[in-house]
């Protein structure tokens, strides 16, 4: 690829973006993992200015960004843009709890799932940080609870407890909604993104879409049509699947006639996953 001439994973669509656009080859981060990177992207601030000095939040952590903090979404919304978040949030939001005595306490342990009231709205959500539309899940795909939240409400009932083990495909045990299929999350989020872009174009609205993917983070779950495509391992298959969907999204911008008036930024929030077995890549 453009960034690694010795890399074995085929990423033609990302390579095309890089060749046609601007690439950043001297980037630095104060913490190369999910939560602090997302915090920096949305706020323009160093992660160590938050209470979280290192590491990441869990799926039940409280909101890291205070509601009065300016984000790129709130800035663009103020300037007339429609704004949307679709994907993996991993910046915390506040679940409603059955017992208010637990409401202001750290919620990181397994027992907290019994205390969450999934019938009520979340608070301190992406909607309160400048996003007109917000759809996604709370943390990484290996962090419960496994539910989609759309504009502060879960989209389906939590009826299952799921867990999976394995080198590539593992996720932690936790509550799972009946519309949440781990393997289909990445394509589902891209489908939602394509629908949003089409809707905004039809309405003639300028828009900002923040699409933070859960992939290729663990669990590494390429869909059936991508399994074995790389000839390397499941992680490489997963990256190829992402590349394909990025290409499809860019093609949609072309078909709608808005690609010349749209800035597309693709970046990573992590280095390569240890589960990727990167020595073969």
Model-derived segments and their meaning:
Residues 1-281:
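Formylglycine-dependent sulfatase
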């Amino acid at each position: 690829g453009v960034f690694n001439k010795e890399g074995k994973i085929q990423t033609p669509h990302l390579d095309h973006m890089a060749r046609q656009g601007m690439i950043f080859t001297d980037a630095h981060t104060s913490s190369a993992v999910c939560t602090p990177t997302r915090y920096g992207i949305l706020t323009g601030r160093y992660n160590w200015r938050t209470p979280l000095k290192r590491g990441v939040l869990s799926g039940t952590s409280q909101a890291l960004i205070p509601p009065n903090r300016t984000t790129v979404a709130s800035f663009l919304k103020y300037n007339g843009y429609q704004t949307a978040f679709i994907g993996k949030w991993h910046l915390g939001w506040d679940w409603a709890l059955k017992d208010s005595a637990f409401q202001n306490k750290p919620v990181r342990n397994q027992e907290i799932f019994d205390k969450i009231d999934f019938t009520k709205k979340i608070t301190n959500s992406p909607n309160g940080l400048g996003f007109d539309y917000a759809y996604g899940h709370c943390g990484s795909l290996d962090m419960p609870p496994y539910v989609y939240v759309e504009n502060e409400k879960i989209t389906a009932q939590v009826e299952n407890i799921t867990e999976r083990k394995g080198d590539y495909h593992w996720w932690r045990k936790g509550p799972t909604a009946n519309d949440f299929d781990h393997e289909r999350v990445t394509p589902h989020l891209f489908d939602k993104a394509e629908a949003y872009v089409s809707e905004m174009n039809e309405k003639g609205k300028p828009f900002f879409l923040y699409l933070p993917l859960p992939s290729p983070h663990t669990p590494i779950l390429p869909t059936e049509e991508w399994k074995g495509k790389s000839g390397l391992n499941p992680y490489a298959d997963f990256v190829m699947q992402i590349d394909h969907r990025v290409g499809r999204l860019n093609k949609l911008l072309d078909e709608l006639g808005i690609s010349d008036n749209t800035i597309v930024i693709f970046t990573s929030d992590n280095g390569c996953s240890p589960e990727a077995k990167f020595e073969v890549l």
